[in-house]
Regions:
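Acidic/His- and Gly-rich active-site-bordering loop/insert found
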Residues: 1-50, 71-79
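Fold-independent oxyanion-binding glycine-rich loops
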Residues: 2-3, 22-24, 44, 52, ...
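Short glycine/proline-enriched coil/turn segments at helix->beta-strand junctions
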Residues: 12-16, 104-106, 173-175
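Acidic/histidine-rich catalytic neighborhood of metal-dependent amide-processing enzymes
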Residues: 55-136
Length: 176
């Protein structure tokens, strides 16, 4: 345990290490749930619950894969496998920063089983930006330019979520 930031589970004792990086924190549940979001509900052969896809399902799958490899003697003697589970992936990766600073050693190769099966081969990315539009206040026609202000804007429950909806209210005045 790394002070609640992360934990690790290792099988094998080889010098070479393969890492599996996963996380167990989740973003807010948001609206639209047909089942309790923080309970695992099995419905029509699927598990529903906040974080079952991102990333608790992959954590459990990784544990089963590690057990299968060990039980079937598939891990070469020179290799070990380490599952690193973080608790702060959704809000800034402090878990990985802490782990990097305190772990005795890092894996030689790693992969992240985050998201849809069988594979996600890209990251959506994250960007913060300011949006502005010149209404002509600094031009020769400044007297005729409308005045506008965003009075309210809300989209999503967190900055790292794709929102289900966005709401923007504006105040615009212009002479007619």
């Amino acid at each position: 345990n790394y002070n609640g930031y992360a934990t690790e589970i290792t099988v094998g004792s080889g010098e070479k290490m393969a890492g599996i990086l996963a996380h167990v924190d989740v973003v807010e549940a948001g609206p639209g749930w047909e089942t309790p979001p923080f309970q695992a509900v099995i419905k029509d052969g699927r598990i529903y619950g906040r974080g079952s896809l991102d990333d608790k399902g992959p954590v459990v799958s990784s544990l089963y894969a590690m057990k299968y490899i060990v039980d079937n003697d598939l891990l070469p003697d020179e290799w070990s496998i380490r599952l690193i589970v973080g608790a702060d992936e959704e809000e800034g990766l402090r878990c990985i920063d802490y782990y990097n600073e305190h772990a005795e050693r890092m894996p030689d190769v790693s992969f992240v089983p985050d998201g849809y099966f069988p594979m996600v081969n890209c990251e959506k990315g994250l960007v913060d930006f300011d949006l502005s539009y010149d209404l002509g206040k600094n031009s020769d026609d400044a007297d005729d330019a409308p005045e506008a202000a965003i009075t309210y804007f809300k989209a999503g429950l967190g900055r790292n979520m794709v929102p289900a909806e966005a709401v923007c209210e504006m105040s615009v005045t212009a002479e007619v």
